[in-house]
Design a protein with these regions (language model features):
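Generic detector of short, locally flexible boundary/turn motifs and exposed helical patches
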Residues: 91-98, 116-121, 153, 187-191, ...
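A short, gly/pro- and small-residue-rich
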Residues: 38, 173, 304
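Long, heptad-repeat coiled-coil alpha-helices used as oligomerization/scaffolding rods
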Residues: 13, 17-20, 27-48, 52-62, ...
Length: 328
């Protein structure tokens, strides 16, 4: 994937609240145009209503302005802007060294079960459909999963405890590995990290490498560093960890994995990728993006997209995460 310096324009993502504005508009505007529109929105804020027709009129006006006015030199060629609720403008920090993707989401197709596929302009499929599972899915009928069109599975191999920091193997990893292989489903693994130092991240990588050797696992998919903030109210050892340290932990884990002969990858939401990880430092490591939407306007490079946490797949009781792997 080549770098896109965005020399023609800044990218503006219009994220509109469901109660006031619906839809998402991407605009190419120079900096003074952005200022003018933001001023207009501020003046109009008091008159906005929940009427969908009025909201769409505002969107149409902004789109028309973006398309008709000349765009010359942007104030910052690597800046990405977001409209938040149609009023406030959030400026993404410039990410030196980050790569951009060339995916055309207008060519994304979704079937009745929410299974997605991305195509190129020649009609060729450029994605593969997959799931990620852990002990939460419990017993899985992998033959039924295969018959439902699943081409790959990312298996949780282990995790580090929120509070104790103890390294643990996912209790369903071995049976999931055996079942997926028997069904001829390509497999990769992810480790749920709570590392707070580079040394701990390297320890996690060594733990994963040891388990892969012990189970004689042959992987067709990456080994993923999955660092997430706890979602419950229990105290976590990762509280207060800086983005720089988190980036260093990811780097340490992925370097170890690569040295062992596996393909590394890191998992992240949009907010974590942009505002915590240094994507420039990690530009040689593929990103597994998590965004639960019908499509994604994420401009930076990613290889895998987790688009749903409430998917339905034959052979699995309950819900499961759905993904597509985008091939070059």
């Amino acid at each position: 994937m080549s770098k896109n310096p965005l020399t023609a324009a800044c990218v503006i993502l219009s994220v509109i609240s469901a109660s006031a504005l619906a839809g998402l508009c991407v605009f190419a505007l120079k900096n003074d145009q952005l200022t003018n529109i933001n001023t207009k929105l501020s003046h109009d804020k008091s008159s906005l209503s929940t009427s969908l027709s009025e909201a769409q009129a505002v969107i149409s006006e902004l789109r028309s302005k973006a398309e008709t006015e000349a765009v010359t030199e942007p104030a910052n060629e690597n800046t990405v802007y977001i409209y938040d609720n149609g009023i406030d403008v959030i400026e993404y920090p410039e990410i030196e060294g980050a790569l951009f993707n060339d995916y055309d989401m207008s060519l994304l197709e979704t079937d009745e079960k929410k299974h997605k596929a991305l195509f190129d302009r020649n009609g060729n499929k450029r994605s593969r459909f997959g799931i990620d599972v852990s002990s939460y899915q419990q017993n899985i009928d992998w033959q039924a999963v295969k018959a439902d069109g699943v081409e790959f599975a990312m298996l949780r191999i282990g995790y580090r405890g929120y509070e104790t920091g103890q390294l643990c193997e996912d209790k369903y990893f071995r049976r999931n590995l055996e079942g997926a292989k028997a069904a001829d489903i390509d497999t990769g693994v992810y480790f749920f990290s709570q590392a707070i130092t580079e040394a701990e991240a390297a320890e996690e990588a060594d733990y994963v490498i040891s388990l892969l050797a012990e189970t004689n696992a042959r992987l067709e998919m990456p080994v993923v560093f999955d660092w997430e903030f706890p979602t419950d109210e229990d105290p976590a050892r990762t509280e207060g960890l800086s983005g720089d340290v988190q980036t260093a932990c990811c780097r340490a884990f992925c370097d170890k994995i690569r040295e062992a002969g596996y393909e590394p990858m890191y998992y992240s939401t949009i907010n974590t990728a942009i505002f915590r990880y240094d994507m420039g430092v990690l530009s040689d490591i593929p990103l597994w993006l998590a965004e639960y939407k019908a499509d994604t306007s994420f401009v930076y490079d990613y290889r895998m997209w987790q688009y749903s946490c409430s998917g339905v797949v034959d052979g699995i009781e309950g819900l499961v995460d759905l993904n597509i792997l985008i091939e070059s």
